[in-house]
Amino acid sequence: VRAQEYRAGGARLSYHVTGEGDPIVLVHGLSGSGRWWRRNVPALAAAHRVYVIDLVGYGRAYRQRALGVRDAAALIAAFTDDLGLERVTLIGHSMGGHICTHVAALRPNRVRHLVLACASGLLTGNIYRVALGLPKAAVTGRLAFVPRVLADAARAGPVNVWRSTTDLLGDNVAELLPRITARTLVVWGARDALVPPRTGRALAAAIPGARYEEIPRAGHVVMVDAPARFNALVLDFLAEDELAAAGEA
């Protein structure tokens, strides 16, 4: 699928689109790219229009200075505005979940569902531990995925990875969480070595009505480690809302 570009304020997002239906926007994490969703897109696109984003400074949108989480969220909010996306499901992994939390707060009328996978946002810690913990966190899961992690980190470059890490550790979403109105699913890998499951439980407890699901034997890159289970959790969560809407009609 050919990549498209969205430009605003001197920044460039890269994205590609597949499928038809209500929109799903996938936002990758620190040092990642849209390719991290490769095992999820076919299942999600069966009944939805899926937008797979490469954040500024990452993936196909590299050779740019990475944005902080709040600026990245403002750009994605503008992206949903300009493309006229309604009833949006935002799915974010790690830093992408952190960004999606901000987007849900910025656009409560557009964002209907929020899925946070091993998300930062309540993460505290030493920048060296977080930046250097990424390769270790990947190794706790599917070993065949490690080359992708390293290739994407190399493409983004150490300066962007460092900049993003510094920014996300300085940004805490705790005060936003009680105001989130989107139906929210929080999914975690039980073996997440970077953002521990207790952080996921705290996120879910702070968001009104949020559900928490933990996948055994999956690590930080939960949607790669356990794609079938991850896809089923997300699709079941979305289907519940569709059934409820049909019942009200």
Say what each PLM segment does:
Residues A11-Y62:
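Conserved HGGG/HGGXW glycine-rich cap/lid loop of the alpha/beta-hydrolase fold
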Residues D71-V88:
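Conserved acidic catalytic loop of the alpha/beta-hydrolase fold
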Residues H98-L106, R110-R142:
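Flexible "cap/lid" loop of the alpha/beta hydrolase fold
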Residues V146-E175:
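Hydrophobic, aromatic-rich cap/lid helix
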Residues V173, A182, P196-A205:
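Short alpha-helix in the alpha/beta-hydrolase fold that links the catalytic acid
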Residues I180, V186-W188, D192:
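Short beta-strand/loop motif that positions the catalytic acidic residue
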Residues A218-N231:
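Catalytic histidine-centered segment of alpha/beta-hydrolase-like enzymes
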